[in-house]
Amino acid sequence: CAEYLSLEVPILGICAGHQFMARHYGWTAGEAPKPEFGAATISLVGDGGPLFQGTPSHQTVWESHNDEVTTPPPGFTVIAESESCRVQAMQNGELDRFGLQFHPEVNDTEFGSNIFENFVNICKSAKSG
């Protein structure tokens, strides 16, 4: 999978993909002190960046993880967090890399469709840029 991260295209890592991305770019993911399963509330950090554009600052997402990213890798910033997981979402705007600990594809993630639409728009902007 590492070869995909060398491509010059936007990439969205979800759950284990988020953790893999953190490892690839120089940080480790490890066992979560408090694994999360089911609905959880995340809070955006700042405006949440382009991935969370048009979504509220607090939202319900679906979690299913024993491991987590505890600190973002160099060049990445935290764009969403929760009480039990500091890095619910991260981004590196320069590389167009985004990681989500939660599952936007699950219906229980309130604004999952918006997140995917925003990612498609990020891809379109990268293609035209």
Task: Label every model-predicted segment.
Residues 4-8, 20, 90-106, 122:
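Catalytic cores of nucleotide-enabled group-transfer and carboxylate-activating enzymes in metabolic
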